[in-house]
Amino acid sequence: CATNKDINASLLDTFIRRIPVKIYLPSLEDRFIEERLTLIERFIKDESLRLDKPVLVSKNSMIALLSYNCPYNVGQLKSDIKLAVANAYSDYFIHHKKQIKINSPDLQKDIKSSLLSPKEDALRLVDLMADTDGYFCYVNYDKYKNYSRALKFLLNYKTYLKEEVLWI
């Protein structure tokens, strides 16, 4: 089971004896910054796919996401990104903006506070990344969505034609 608690305190001894393999997965703090970036990008692209729109992330927001202390690891990181995207989408929808942009105000307070003392690795990594007007763009459209609609239409039309031929 995935936990950051002491397994001896939470699992029965008999259960532990029957499954003798222990796997150690490092926390986000113990991983390389590039791996954290990969996770952040994956979660933002997942939200982009869900919304069917590109999501842009400001440089400061990316630095904050790369720098903040995330005690509940990957699950918390994913939840925090979902909340940031939801806040950005709300701003996009209410103010009729052209794009969904994650800016510092869309982040939770503890994430924003990491901007006061960002990690050096995060600053270097963000400087190396290609951006457009201070934003990183993440798009993850279902490129086959429109094709599948057309295919369904053609299959239905083919069935319709077969039925018409049978009735003649």
Predicted features, each with a name:
Residues N8-D13, I33-L37, E41, K59-M62, ...:
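Amphipathic alpha-helical transducer elements in NTP-driven molecular machines
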Residues D6, R17-R18, K22, E35-L51:
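Conserved AAA+ ATPase "sensor/coupling" helix adjacent to the nucleotide-binding pocket
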Residues P105-W167:
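C-terminal engagement/docking regions of AAA+ P-loop ATPases
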Residues Y92-Q108:
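Flexible, glycine/charge-rich interdomain/linker segments that couple
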Residues I63-L66, G75-F93:
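C-terminal helical "lid" of AAA+/P-loop NTPase domains
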Residues K53-C70, H96-Q99:
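Short conserved motifs of the RecA-like P-loop NTPase core
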Residues C1-N4:
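Structural recognition of the conserved hydrophobic beta-strand(s) that form the central parallel beta-sheet
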Residues S10-E29:
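A short helix-turn-beta junction within AAA+ P-loop NTPase domains corresponding to the substrate/partner-engaging
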